[in-house]
A protein has these predicted regions:
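Extended amphipathic alpha-helical scaffolds
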Residues: 1-45, 53, 229-369, 554-568, ...
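Glycine-rich, flexible beta-strand/loop modules in the N-terminal catalytic cores of phosphate-handling
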Residues: 25-110, 115-117, 122, 188, ...
């Protein structure tokens, strides 16, 4: 039996159908927002997965090209691997949902979102976030929801709830906020240097809207919700845990984790595990639980140190940033490079400049964006954490971190008109102990400036963490969290920005939400840290972008022609443009508006190519002198090619002021000559006079 529920959301109708499709899933919501349609399902395995110490949640956001009336390309004509946008949407759906499942739940859970129709005015990503929350809430899967999500834009100083595609194009803010009944559980934002107080206002505006959505979801759950099923609770044997704590002692564990060197700490923990392996060698059941038990003991120890003793594992104050170092020009022949280090986290970013034709082409369901001029790629090799594993290409985490850094830097990049280059930055993680994504933002900002990209302002990033106690007021916020504080803490609140304001936020938490007080304090803390990094570390290295691109970067000049003359520049089967390229060695890109980009490391060759193009598209003026080549000789004169599409004739009487008996006495085929235009007759024929021969 199908049941329908609807509400007005930002001037459009959100309609949810339950029972119409996918009845065999644990929960299914057929979502309609405007003309956007997404099927969201939640399914769980009947039994827990053996041998794991984590909750196995998978989230899939599937973009079907039929949703926008397109047929996939390629030989198979089927959708291939997920797009970058789909992977990022998977992650943004996952983040508010994961903390609300029981921590000891080991059944496989899959949240699938099938995008079936796309209305550009109604975000399919937001629809999928709401759909996953509803499908899980009405299912029998244990879940402490519901959650609700809202997008906020900022146009001319006014907030816009769930902006349309057209509004997003002119918005200074792209904010997504997910909430529970009382608290904010997820924040993701890209912004054009939005001040901190405006960002906070937008976050809490979204939280208010989310409360109305949660009331709507409650009505659906009340009518369609299933009773949550019982499950096998996965816990470490209490007797084993108590024996371990008594044997190792809390003091010894605190001593093991209290060091500013990651490898020393890992060696200390491994030594503890070896002692336990020896102690429990005869008890297979306890032996199998050592890893989880030691992890839990570490976590309890670290959280107590921070919360009760205000002591961090590496000895820092709660507001103290790890030692910082920055430098530029690390690599000799690249277009731009920089190294940024924060404690034992080290990132090198390399910038490469290319023609706009090298921008990334996007083939997905977003028909408003078909190319991406700025690309940020993030690589996290195994050696950065002292491990050995084969490289299989970027995973979801690497794609997500790259996108976060990209989002943080896009607002300060120059326009195509100001800087007609495609730009790629690659962040190579050399060493990792937490906050590599924020390190890549700092390194990339430095690298861009070193490459001569005229950014509006340098950008820095920082991550703050959180350890909570029993009540809402019992917490400690940590500036610049290292890996251990990320693993055992409750929050990873990443913020990037300039002196002027915020350019990106990404908030991940492991608890059931944050109070307004914590969010305000966290953003204030990031502002302090960003100011310190910019002024005390980055600016002394390179305070602003260089006024020229690097020695080995291509130079670009632009020249605009009448679009109707594009065919003249290209020539039949590309003969003309290829001739220019062969003669000058430049790279030429022409777009349909008539803009021509000419690239080369040699400015003289760029100038020569422009001169040739001008000779093709610009009309000849009577009385002006032009250079050309003699291409044909007749008994009455010589024909001179002035450009690929223009030639004229020098009558034998105009070859010299003296009488000429034979044309070949003055010029021959292949001679370079300077000629004056005497006349362009009604038929377009060009009559010339020889001024001089040009010697090689």
């Amino acid at each position: 039996m199908t049941k329908q529920f609807s509400m007005e959301l930002a001037g459009r109708t959100l309609m949810v159908e339950v029972g119409r499709v996918a009845a065999q899933a644990n929960g299914a919501a057929f979502m309609h927002y405007g003309d956007t349609v997404v099927l969201s399902t939640a399914t769980a395995s009947e039994k827990p997965r053996d041998g794991i110490d984590f909750f196995p949640l998978s989230v899939e956001y599937e973009e079907k090209l039929y949703a926008v009336g397109k047929i996939p390309g390629g030989y198979l004509k089927r959708e291939g691997k997920p797009s970058e946008n789909a992977i990022l949407t998977d992650r943004v759906i996952d983040r508010p949902m994961r903390p609300l499942f029981p921590k000891d739940y080991r059944n496989d859970v899959a949240l699938n979102n099938l995008v079936m129709s796309v209305d550009p005015d109604c975000s399919p990503e937001l629809t999928a976030m709401l759909g996953s929350a509803i499908a899980t809430a009405i299912s029998d899967i244990p879940f402490d929801g519901p959650t609700a999500s809202t997008m906020v834009g900022l146009i001319d100083g006014e907030f816009v709830i769930n902006p349309t595609s057209a509004q997003k194009e002119v918005s200074d803010l792209a904010l997504t906020v997910a909430s529970t009944r009382e608290k904010v559980i997820m924040i993701e934002a890209g912004a054009n240097e939005v001040p901190e107080d405006v960002m906070l206002e937008a976050i809490f505006k979204a939280h208010e809207v989310n409360q109305e959505i949660i009331k709507f979801i409650d009505t659906i759950v009340a009518e369609c919700g299933k009773e949550k099923h019982d499950y096998e609770h996965h816990i470490v044997d209490p007797e084993m845990y108590d024996d371990m704590v008594a044997f190792i002692t809390p003091e010894a564990m605190e001593e093991a984790v209290f060091t500013d060197d990651k490898q020393t700490r890992e060696a200390n923990i491994r030594a503890i595990e070896e002692k336990l392996e020896e102690r429990y060698a005869e008890n297979e059941e306890w032996l199998a639980q050592i890893g989880e038990a030691v992890y839990a003991f570490q976590k309890k120890t670290v959280r107590k140190m921070i919360l009760k003793d205000h002591k961090r594992p590496d000895g820092r104050d709660i507001k103290q940033i790890r030692p910082l170092h920055a430098e530029v020009d690390c690599l000799p022949r690249v277009h731009g490079s920089a190294l940024f280090q924060r404690g034992q986290t080290q990132v090198m970013t390399v910038t490469t400049l290319g023609s706009l034709s090298e921008a990334q082409r996007l083939d997905g369901i977003d028909v408003t964006e078909t190319t991406k001029r700025y690309m940020h790629h993030y690589n996290f090799p195994s050696y950065s954490v002292g491990e050995t594993r084969p490289s299989r290409g970027p995973g979801r985490r690497e794609i997500g971190h790259g996108a976060l850094a990209e989002r943080a830097l896009v607002p300060v990049l120059p326009s195509e008109e100001e800087f007609p280059y495609a730009i790629r930055t690659v962040s190579e993680i050399m060493e990792s102990n937490g906050s590599t994504s924020q390190g890549s933002i700092c390194a990339s900002s430095l690298s861009l400036m070193a490459a001569g990209v005229p950014v509006k302002a340098p950008v820095a990033g920082i991550s703050v963490g959180l350890v909570t106690g029993e009540g809402d007021d019992d917490y400690i916020i940590l500036t610049d969290i290292q890996g251990l504080e990320d693993f055992f803490g409750d929050m990873d609140f990443k913020v990037a920005g300039t002196d002027k304001g915020i350019t990106a936020i990404q908030m991940d938490i492991k608890i059931h939400g944050l109070t307004e007080q914590i969010i305000r304090e966290a953003i204030a803390r990031t502002k302090e840290a960003i100011t310190h990094i910019l002024h005390d570390v980055m600016n002394p290295v390179i305070p602003a972008a260089r006024d020229h691109v690097g020695e080995f970067a291509p130079k670009i000049s632009q020249y605009t022609i009448d679009p109707e003359k594009i065919s003249e520049v290209i020539g039949k089967q590309g003969k003309t443009i290829n001739g220019i390229i062969d003669e000058t060695g430049v790279k030429i890109d022409i777009d349909e508006s008539g803009r021509i980009d000419i690239l080369s490391e040699d400015q003289a060759m760029i100038d020569k190519a422009i001169s040739i193009i001008k000779s093709i598209v610009e009309p000849l003026n009577v009385g002006d002198i032009y250079e050309g080549e003699v291409v044909r000789i007749m008994n009455f004169g010589a024909f001179v090619q002035l450009s690929s599409n223009k030639d004229g004739m020098i009558h034998i009487s105009k070859l010299s002021n003296e009488r000429v008996e034979k044309v070949e006495d003055v010029v021959n085929i292949g001679d370079k000559v300077a000629v004056k235009v005497l006349e362009i007759d009604k038929m377009g024929r060009i009559n010339l006079k020889l001024e001089e021969k040009i010697e090689d």
